[in-house]
């Protein structure tokens, strides 16, 4: 059962459901965030403990409340399998509003990140009315860079983000 933490709009694509996180997502989310191959491109680059993963889910719920947008849990529509997180993010201290995406290894290489990020980008433009949209990506994260470039983003500026060399990719205004 997926009881949403709060009322979060749902987005659907051909293969994905983007929905609010619920309590039943925690185990798979904690598993994903404990994987060093996932975490090496995020925040300080280290895997999250279960407690940290729980706090992150709580932050996502708070982001929806305080900002009116946030990250969605991503599941494969046919199987219902949890795949990761995708959405709009701009917590205090971030340099810009961004489209963020993190998928579990079992979802890599299938085009899910691009499909979900495209839906989030459309939501940011059409529903939120955003014109300045970015993705902040570590220089070493080639897969995420490919996703942002495939959606029309261009490298804008180099920054240090959570201690790692990163680039802000800006999506074109439409």
Enumerate the language-model features and the residues they cover.
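Active-site rim helix/loop that mediates acceptor-substrate recognition in acyltransferases
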Residues: 46-67
